[in-house]
From Swiss-Prot:
Signal peptide: none annotated. Belongs to the universal ribosomal protein uL4 family. Keywords: Ribonucleoprotein, Ribosomal protein, RNA-binding, rRNA-binding. It comes from Rickettsia conorii (strain ATCC VR-613 / Malish 7). One of its GO terms (cellular component) is ribosome. This is Large ribosomal subunit protein uL4. One of the primary rRNA binding proteins, this protein initially binds near the 5'-end of the 23S rRNA. It is important during the early stages of 50S assembly. It makes multiple contacts with different domains of the 23S rRNA in the assembled 50S subunit and ribosome.
Length: 207
């Protein structure tokens, strides 16, 4: 499958052949894409939520009042779960939310996400993702030429430092090396910009 190579000025400068097994899968598997996104989001969760149990709450262990004769229900401790300021029964604990997902499925998810963007016409190949100076205003003007609201930019094995610094303060714009290409960011951004180097490295990686 052939597609245009664009410059950062959004002008056609050539043509590139894309591997159809990676960028033009015939049937897009949304279920696989969702599986991978769920796996990514679960892995990213901090899991540091926690409540205190009866044994962890600070307070006395003294019986609040005598067993009989008060007319109240019997109580053994002010730290019990039914008492105000007491512990929490079956509350959240610190844990990892990460789940396991086979590499084969993760790879398929990336392929189908790239194919989906390509089918929408929102995957663009750029000849070079390099800037002379790390100027945010200059990069904003460049991205405005593509008329998109959000951009996921994938470079080769290394990201141009000037491009990276310029993109830091731009809302909904993320730049990563090819190893950082992931399904969640591809789907949640409107446009995916790939450098020529990124295309060749991704095709080699996902073959």
């Amino acid at each position: 499958m052939k597609t245009k190579i664009l410059s950062l000025a959004n002008e056609e400068v050539g043509e590139i052949s894309l591997n159809e097994d990676i960028f033009a899968v015939e049937f897009i598997r949304d279920d696989i894409i969702k599986q991978v996104i769920d796996w990514q989001r679960a892995k990213a969760m901090s899991g540091n939520h926690k409540t205190k149990t009866v044994s962890e709450v600070l307070g006395t262990t003294k019986k609040p009042f005598k067993q009989k004769g008060t007319g109240n229900a019997r109580q053994g401790s002010l730290r019990s779960v039914q008492m105000r300021g007491g512990g929490v029964a079956h509350g959240p604990r610190v844990r990892s939310h990460a789940t396991k997902l086979p590499k084969k499925v993760r790879k398929l998810g990336l392929i189908h996400a790239l194919s989906e963007k390509c089918a929408e016409g929102k995957l663009l190949v750029i000849d070079s993702l390099k800037l002379d100076k790390p100027k945010t205003s200059a990069l904003v003007n460049i991205l405005n030429k593509f008329q998109g609201k959000s951009f996921f930019v994938i470079d080769g094995n290394e990201v141009d430092i000037n491009f990276s610094l310029a993109a830091k303060n731009i809302y909904n714009t993320v730049i990563v090396p090819q190893i950082g290409a992931n399904v969640y960011d591809i789907i949640r951004h409107e446009y995916v910009l790939l450098s020529q180097e990124a295309v060749s490295v991704l095709e080699e990686r996902l073959r």
